[in-house]
A protein has these predicted regions:
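Hydrophobic beta-strand anchors of alpha/beta hydrolase catalytic cores
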Residues: 71-72, 104, 156
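Thiol/disulfide oxidoreductase modules built on the thioredoxin-like
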Residues: 66, 129-131, 137-187
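Short, acidic, Ser/Thr-enriched surface-loop or helix-capping motifs
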Residues: 43, 56-57, 159-160
């Protein structure tokens, strides 16, 4: 399984430290998902998700292609809920509670140099964000967030191994609940 975590960004091309870029170009292949709402039935469930190609803070390539179940986590550095969620995700990983076979990818989005907790790269490093979880930097135009219908932060999108949306959640989620929802969603899609 794979999980993708995203962090928000608002401007392009800004460098914070030598070799670290907080914004990146994101290519989207496929149709964008509808914006998420609190409706009882999410119209994106079962829909083929777009594939994102972008880069991490140091220019490494990050792609959200099908192949393994993947959790995308969209994070904004200035979001209080995200600031509470990241340490929970770190503990979830270090305690070995992440479902076996799940890939996790973070996406930093809605990045704003004028907002608190900037830059996202330093924030995630301070929190000891798992190094094996790729982090994609969104564009200043929030290309990745828009493609996945992000409506709040943190925002979770679970993709099955075929790349179809199995679950979307907005807001802080306890990791026990997250694990349960992931397992239930993947059981429904198999």
């Amino acid at each position: 399984m794979a999980a993708i975590i995203a962090v928000a960004s608002q401007s392009g091309g800004d460098f914070v430290a030598a070799g670290v870029e907080e914004f990146g170009k994101v290519e989207v292949v496929g149709d964008s998902l509808p914006e998420f709402s609190d409706a009882a039935i999410d119209p994106a469930i079962g829909v083929m998700a777009p594939v994102l190609t972008g880069q991490g803070f140091t220019g490494n390539s990050v792609v959200t292609s099908p192949g393994a179940p993947t959790l995308l986590v969209f994070l904004a550095h200035w979001c209080g809920f995200c600031q509470r969620e990241v340490p929970l995700l770190v503990k979830w990983n270090s305690a070995g509670e992440v479902p076996v076979g799940l890939d996790v990818v973070a996406i930093t989005t809605s990045t704003d140099p004028a907002s608190p907790n900037f830059p996202p790269s330093e924030w995630l490093a301070r929190e000891k964000f798992p190094p094996l979880w790729p982090v994609m930097t969104d564009s200043g135009e929030k290309t990745a967030a828009t493609a996945f219908g992000v409506s709040g932060f943190p925002f979770f999108v679970l993709l099955d191994a075929e790349g179809k949306v199995a679950l979307r959640l907005s807001g802080g989620v306890e990791t026990g609940v997250l694990t349960e929802q992931i397992n239930q969603a993947l059981t429904r899609t198999n």
